[in-house]
């Protein structure tokens, strides 16, 4: 006979013999069919809405919802796209989602402790006996159902539920911190790759200008105006420019690979995806919105890593209450219904019906002092969580102060790097005009060109350092959102 058919007959027989259990049995057996996905069945409402609707980042008006088709290798990658990919593909972010699901499941278990539990069973007995007077055969089936419900436990379930609730909030805050860290990492890697590409382009311009200087030196030598040493110096400069360009190309490729790894894209393809970065518009910076004390005060109150550590401390304190309550009395109620006798006691008489209702009071008297040590361990865990909170606060505030110093330094260097580049460009133009008419030698021309190369690289580094530090400052303060990327990148 089909197992499902046997189960249905068993439950129907118990329900008919015990009418009060009918509603409970129907609710128990039909509940899993309410959701298409078993993991989404949440009758106790323990699952946070972020798991179904997505995450809302600071300053955003749209939820973060990841899609498997969001990455296309042929698409030009801007900063917002890079951040979105990091938020969806990075293993650390995916692990934070799993941690939320785990804590939600534990919260559901804690809430389930307030509900009764129902179990049912069946047994079949066959008795074949024979004697000098003949033989007999007897077959009887036994059905039973038991309902148990904890009525009183002196606060243990309440403390356990509060701890689970706080740990879920800690998991949500930890995920916020993981998202901010992922965005900060993506911003740094993106601007490293962007800076490497700009450096490669600067080396290409330097090589083109060096070749122009070489052509001019060759023509001057052919006309008898220049000398062979000048031509050789120009050739040396071209060879050096080619070497520096080759190194810049290698650094650019390395930065793109590091960006792909940091965004978690290597797991999406068999090879390293070919990334193409968008061009950044150079605009005048607007400066920092707040001073360092304001940033630090905001981080102390709202940084997700600090909020998560505080929640861990609160959960540890609730665990102390749980440990203490386990040594207190508990009161349970049980109700059982037996049809055709009790199980494991041989076959009863057909048609027998028995109902048993009872209260069970359990009073722990002596546990070998284990309860004392368990409470001491719970107190020690509170001290450990408090120390971890202080460590997280120091780490967050220290990183924020360092990033603020980097941002202010990069902001001050922007104007200097622009002036340096403008002066170096005018110097090259002036020396080149003089060199074309024979009023300057090759050494002066090459020195001016080398100074221009250095000025271009300094400008590239200054812009990259400012944009990266500005956004990392937002992330280290726990305030970065996708909507703020475009505006913040121009400051």
Predicted regions and their residues:
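Terminal intrinsically disordered/low-complexity segments used for targeting and assembly
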Residues: 1-85, 249-297, 475-491
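Small/polar, glycine/serine/threonine/aspartate-rich low-complexity segments that form flexible
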Residues: 64-75, 121-149, 276-289, 321, ...
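A glycine-/polar-enriched beta->alpha junction
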Residues: 84-94, 101-117, 145-163, 173-180, ...
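Amphipathic alpha-helical coiled-coil segments
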Residues: 95-110, 178, 182-205, 212-214, ...
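"Short basic amphipathic alpha-helical interaction patches in structured regions
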Residues: 99, 134-139, 159-167, 342
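Transmembrane beta-barrel architecture of outer-membrane proteins
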Residues: 102, 140-142, 188, 233, ...
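Periplasmic alpha-helical coiled-coil/stalk elements that build and connect Gram-negative outer-membrane
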Residues: 166, 173, 177-298, 403-406, ...
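Metallo-beta-lactamase
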Residues: 248, 304, 311, 462
């Amino acid at each position: 006979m089909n197992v499902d058919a046997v189960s249905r007959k068993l439950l129907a027989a118990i329900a008919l013999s015990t009418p009060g259990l009918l509603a409970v049995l129907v609710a128990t057996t039909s509940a899993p069919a309410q959701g298409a996905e078993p993991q989404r069945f949440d009758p106790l409402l323990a699952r946070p809405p972020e798991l179904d609707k997505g995450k809302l980042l600071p300053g955003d008006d749209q939820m973060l919802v990841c899609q498997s088709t969001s990455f296309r290798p042929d698409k030009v990658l801007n900063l917002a796209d890079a951040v979105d990919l990091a938020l969806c593909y990075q293993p650390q972010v995916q692990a934070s989602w799993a941690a939320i699901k785990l804590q939600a499941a534990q919260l559901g278990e804690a809430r389930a402790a307030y509900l009764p539990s129902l179990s049912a069973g069946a047994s079949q007995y066959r008795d074949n006996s024979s004697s000098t007077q003949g033989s007999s055969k007897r077959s009887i089936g036994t059905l039973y159902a038991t309902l148990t419900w904890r009525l009183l436990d002196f606060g243990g379930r309440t403390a356990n539920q509060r701890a689970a609730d706080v740990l879920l909030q800690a998991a949500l805050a930890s995920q916020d911190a993981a998202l901010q860290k992922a965005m900060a990492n993506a911003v740094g890697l993106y601007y490293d790759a962007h800076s490497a590409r700009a450096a490669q382009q600067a080396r290409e311009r330097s090589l083109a200008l060096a070749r122009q200087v070489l052509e001019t030196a060759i023509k001057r030598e052919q006309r008898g105006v220049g000398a062979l040493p000048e031509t050789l110096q120009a050739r040396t400069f071209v060879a050096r420019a080619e070497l520096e360009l080759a190194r810049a190309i290698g650094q650019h490729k390395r930065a793109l690979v590091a960006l792909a790894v940091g965004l978690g894209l290597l797991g999406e393809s068999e090879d390293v995806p070919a990334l193409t970065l968008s061009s950044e518009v150079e605009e005048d910076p607007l400066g920092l919105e707040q001073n360092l004390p304001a940033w630090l005060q905001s981080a102390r109150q709202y940084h997700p890593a600090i909020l998560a550590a505080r929640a861990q401390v609160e959960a540890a304190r609730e665990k102390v209450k749980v440990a203490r309550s386990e040594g207190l009395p508990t009161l349970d109620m049980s109700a059982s219904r037996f049809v055709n006798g009790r199980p494991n006691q041989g076959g009863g008489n057909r048609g027998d019906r028995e109902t048993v209702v009872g209260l069970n009071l359990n009073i722990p008297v002596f546990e070998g002092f284990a309860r004392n040590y368990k409470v001491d361990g719970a107190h020690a865990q509170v001290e450990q969580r408090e120390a971890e909170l202080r460590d997280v606060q120091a780490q967050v505030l220290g990183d924020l102060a360092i990033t603020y110093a980097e941002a202010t330094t990069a902001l001050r260097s922007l104007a200097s790097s622009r002036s340096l580049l403008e002066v170096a460009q005018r110097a090259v133009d002036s020396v080149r005009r003089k060199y074309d008419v024979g009023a300057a030698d090759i050494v002066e021309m090459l020195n001016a060109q080398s100074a221009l190369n250095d000025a271009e690289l300094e400008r590239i580094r200054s812009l990259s350092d400012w944009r990266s530090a500005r956004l990392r400052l937002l992330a280290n303060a726990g305030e970065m959102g996708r909507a703020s990327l475009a505006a913040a990148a121009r400051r």
